[in-house]
């Protein structure tokens, strides 16, 4: 059978349909991971296997209605995303289709099949300012910043020469207003001229090149005391939040998006509930951050990739790659980006389903054998880097992946594969959540491997903090050991020192680690407040121990200390109610 060409594109024919997986013959010359258009409605698909002239395609849209013999169009390019002004503050689906634009055009609640809308608005006018250090005749190489566009009040969008390009500037647009279709740069390389607009495309599976990877040494401040004080991450780190249903993974992810010290947020809802994305869309525009002397909505530094659980399964993989590629683009501008993937378990389930339809050999719990490799290739795109091109700049991507192990079982293949890759583990505990202790991060099983990297930062700014942190961990661990004895013989039979340990551990648990996300004073805790709260609690612990040991024949007891220092203890416990907006002198 001969291969047909339609509009210069090669045309294959469907020979088998199995859910989101389609087999097509006559696909000679097609490439792995090439983007194809399937059926008469031109559904978006991607080639994931080639055998002779037969290609196996995963389709990113609902495949009902496809029939044997329908055409398959090869586009000749891989699945790519559009990168340019207009990304921030927008909401896309897993294959970067703008949901608001689709809603306007279709007047439908759901995305119509085969809809083809450009990711970025071609008609919108942007204010372009050329770089001061470049002029016609200057050489320009990959990654060089040749213009700036004020994308939002929070982000100046730097227009960079795409990777793999270089030459001499023939034309550089003067300051003014341009659309994404207008030429703003023309270069000449060996007699060949190329024109560039403010937008370019990049394949999602290919990491964007960098000059070098750097050691991360600045903390990612989340505003959550338990994370910042006990298990900190760095800007450019990898974190996992595994937890059973109802433990608060999404709330922690959203809190990081709202309050962390990142320049930009990419929030990928990968196979999660639709109402959670609706909550994000409702909450984020109302939340503000102070920039100079004005308040700005945090939506202006946030990009949402919504891929809810009722959307096609295959698109979950695309949504993860779309999110990380856009994050890399903003990182290349010299920004610190946080990417939330909620949840990677849903992506793994999609891999399992497609792997099953391809009749691949299943590994643990039916997941494919390459699950760990796929997770690693995703998490390894995080990190702090020295960006390509001039001027010299550094950027970072922090990946926070939520994991939903069935029944909260951390030996689940997705969780164990993730823990082998990430450096920070914020383990959520169902029992803490049932006790209404939020964030329900279990302080006995969680860990951070970035403490060594962050020591110079703490030594310079909060010299005593590391001692307080170590002491707090010891108190919480000792409390866990003592609880077994207490359950057997009761509190009264313990030594006074142990009673003090239990009292201070309770104080740390209830008044320091627990945090109310729904109050003005406690939804965000600046790091200095965390340090001062911890300092006061540890000082009380040390002074109480000295009073008990040094009381001689009088035998000063915890009960007497509580009686004499009741007001002080009450003040220490009530520090969380103090609003940080009133200044640090309160503490």
Curated annotation (Swiss-Prot):
The keyword Oxidoreductase does not apply. It catalyses: ATP + H2O + 4 H(+)(in) = ADP + phosphate + 5 H(+)(out). V-ATPase is a heteromultimeric enzyme composed of a peripheral catalytic V1 complex (main components: subunits A, B, C, D, E, and F) attached to an integral membrane V0 proton pore complex (main component: the proteolipid protein). PROSITE patterns: ATPASE_ALPHA_BETA. InterPro entries: ATP-synt_VA_C, ATP-synth_a_Xtn, ATP_synth_asu-like_sf, ATPase_a/bsu_AS, ATPase_F1/V1/A1_a/bsu_N, ATPase_F1/V1/A1_a/bsu_N_sf, ATPase_F1/V1/A1_a/bsu_nucl-bd, ATPase_F1/V1_b/a_C. Belongs to the ATPase alpha/beta chains family. GO terms for cellular component: proton-transporting V-type ATPase, V1 domain. Disulfide bonds: none annotated. GO terms for molecular function: ATP binding; ATP hydrolysis activity; proton-transporting ATPase activity, rotational mechanism. Keywords: ATP-binding, Hydrogen ion transport, Ion transport, Nucleotide-binding, Translocase, Transport. The keyword ATP-binding applies. GO terms for biological process: ATP metabolic process. HAMAP family: ATP_synth_A_arch. Its EC number is 7.1.2.2. It comes from Cyanidium caldarium. Catalytic subunit of the peripheral V1 complex of vacuolar ATPase. V-ATPase vacuolar ATPase is responsible for acidifying a variety of intracellular compartments in eukaryotic cells. Pfam families: ATP-synt_ab, ATP-synt_ab_N, ATP-synt_ab_Xtn, ATP-synt_VA_C. The lineage of its organism: Eukaryota, Rhodophyta, Bangiophyceae, Cyanidiales, Cyanidiaceae. This is V-type proton ATPase catalytic subunit A. NCBIfam families: PRK04192.1, V-ATPase_V1_A. ATP binds at residues 243-250.
